[in-house]
């Protein structure tokens, strides 16, 4: 999948920091 789908599945924005992504 592309990055947009990756972030969308996590429920975070493309501008989210790595820490926010890990928390998601």
From Swiss-Prot:
Binds 2 Zn(2+) ions per monomer. Coiled coil: none annotated. Keywords: Chaperone, Cytoplasm, DNA replication, Metal-binding, Repeat, Stress response, Zinc. InterPro entries: J_dom_sf. Residues 3-24 form the J domain. GO terms for cellular component: cytoplasm. GO terms for biological process: DNA replication. It comes from the Bacteria. It is found in: Cytoplasm. GO terms for molecular function: metal ion binding. Its main location: cytoplasm. Its cofactor is Zn(2+). The keyword Metal-binding applies. Homodimer. Belongs to the DnaJ family. Participates actively in the response to hyperosmotic and heat shock by preventing the aggregation of stress-denatured proteins and by disaggregating proteins, also in an autonomous, DnaK-independent fashion. Unfolded proteins bind initially to DnaJ; upon interaction with the DnaJ-bound protein, DnaK hydrolyzes its bound ATP, resulting in the formation of a stable complex. GrpE releases ADP from DnaK; ATP binding to DnaK triggers the release of the substrate protein, thus completing the reaction cycle. The J domain is necessary and sufficient to stimulate DnaK ATPase activity. Zinc center 1 plays an important role in the autonomous, DnaK-independent chaperone activity of DnaJ. Zinc center 2 is essential for interaction with DnaK and for DnaJ activity. This is Chaperone protein DnaJ. It comes from Streptococcus agalactiae. The lineage of its organism: Bacteria, Bacillati, Bacillota, Bacilli, Lactobacillales.
């Amino acid at each position: 999948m592309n990055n947009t789908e990756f972030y969308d599945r996590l429920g975070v924005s493309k501008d989210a920091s790595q820490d926010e992504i890990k928390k998601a």
